[in-house]
Amino acid sequence: MSYRRELEKYRDLDEDEILGALTEEELRTLENELDELDPDNALLPAGLRQKDQTTKAPTGPFKREELLDHLEKQAKEFKDREDLVPYTGEKRGKVWVPKQKPLDPVLESVTLEPELEEALANASDAELCDIAAILGMHTLMSNQQYYQALSSSSIMNKEGLNSVIKPTQYKPVPDEEPNSTDVEETLERIKNNDPKLEEVNLNNIRNIPIPTLKAYAEALKENSYVKKFSIVGTRSNDPVAYALAEMLKENKVLKTLNVESNFISGAGILRLVEALPYNTSLVEMKIDNQSQPLGNKVEMEIVSMLEKNATLLKFGYHFTQQGPRLRASNAMMNNNDLVRKRRLADLTGPIIPKCRSGV
C-alpha cells in the first residue's frame, strides 16, 4: 500500500513542464539514457547506435587531394629502415638451364611386296577401313564401323576412316495401349457370378469413381469364380481398402489381390492385412508403391500379421527396415515350405506350422 501511495504523488505531474525546465545538456543526457533503454537499439548497426562523442567544430573544410598529397609527402620524408645484412649482389647456386627436348626418331621406310604396295595404293577409304578393322586398329574408327567390318565378308563401311560418325538408328517403341476393360459390364458379370470371368484387370483406369470400386468389392463377396483382382493405378484410397478388407473376410475363392500404386495410407493397408486370418484362399497380395510411406510402426504390425498367416505365399511390398524385411521373408518361406510338404505328403487336412519367433 505504501508503494501505491508513493506512486500517487507522481500521477498529476506535468511532463512538459519538467522537460521545459531542463537545460540543453540535461536533455542530451536524458536522450542518451533513453536510447540505451530501448530494446530495439541492440539490433541496430554500430554506426547508428553510436552517438557523437564530441561537439567540437571542424578546424577547416575537408579537402581530399590536399590530404593525399600530405600523406604522400610524409611517406617520402620518412627514412627507410636499413637492412640488418647489407646486400652484396653475390649470386649463389647454379644457373638453371632447360633440358633439350628429345628429337623424334626418324621412321624407317617399310618395304612391302609389290603386290601389297599396289593394292594399298589403289584401295579406297572404305577398303582401308575394313583392313584397319581386320588388323585390330579399332582406335581409327567407331565401334559401329569396327563390328560391321568383322561381322561381314563384304565391304560394309562405305564412308571410310574420316567419315562423320552416325548414331545407331532409333527403333521407335509404340506406347502401351490403354486398358480396354469395360468397367460397368465387368461389374455386372461379377454380380451375375459369370463362370467365364476368372480375372479382373482394372489397371491404370483412372476415371473409375470410388463408389464403383466399392461396388466391385461388395460384388466379390458372393462371387465364386474370380481368382485374380487387380486395381493398380486407379487412385484408390482408404474407403476402397476398407471395402476390400470386408470382402476378404467373406470371399473364399480369390487367390491374387493387387492394389499397388494407389493412395492407400497405413490405416487402409493395416485393415487389408488384418483381414488375412479370415481368408484361407488368398496366396498373393501386392500393396507396394503407395502415395505415402507406411512407416516403421505399420511395417512391424504387418509383419506380425504375416507371421500368424499360414496360407499367403507371396507378399509384394518392399520393407524399408531390415528387421521387418527379414521377418516377412522368413514367414513367406515357411508358408511355401508348408505347401511343399503338403504336396509331397499328399495330405488333405491342414498342417500345423512350426513355431515362429515373435508370434
Curated annotation (Swiss-Prot):
The keyword RNA-binding does not apply. Pfam families: Tropomodulin. Gene3D superfamilies: Ribonuclease Inhibitor. It is found in: Cytoplasm, Cytoskeleton. Residues 36-61 are annotated as: Disordered. One of its GO terms (cellular component) is striated muscle thin filament. GO terms for molecular function: actin binding; tropomyosin binding. GO terms for biological process: actin filament organization; adult locomotory behavior; lens fiber cell development; muscle contraction; myofibril assembly; pointed-end actin filament capping. Keywords: Actin-binding, Cytoplasm, Cytoskeleton. Highly expressed in the erythrocyte, heart and skeletal muscle. Its main location: cytoplasm. Residues 39-138 are annotated as: Tropomyosin-binding. It comes from the Eukaryota. Blocks the elongation and depolymerization of the actin filaments at the pointed end. The Tmod/TM complex contributes to the formation of the short actin protofilament, which in turn defines the geometry of the membrane skeleton. May play an important role in regulating the organization of actin filaments by preferentially binding to a specific tropomyosin isoform at its N-terminus. Binds to the N-terminus of tropomyosin and to actin. Interacts with FLII. Belongs to the tropomodulin family. This is Tropomodulin-1. It comes from Homo sapiens (Human).
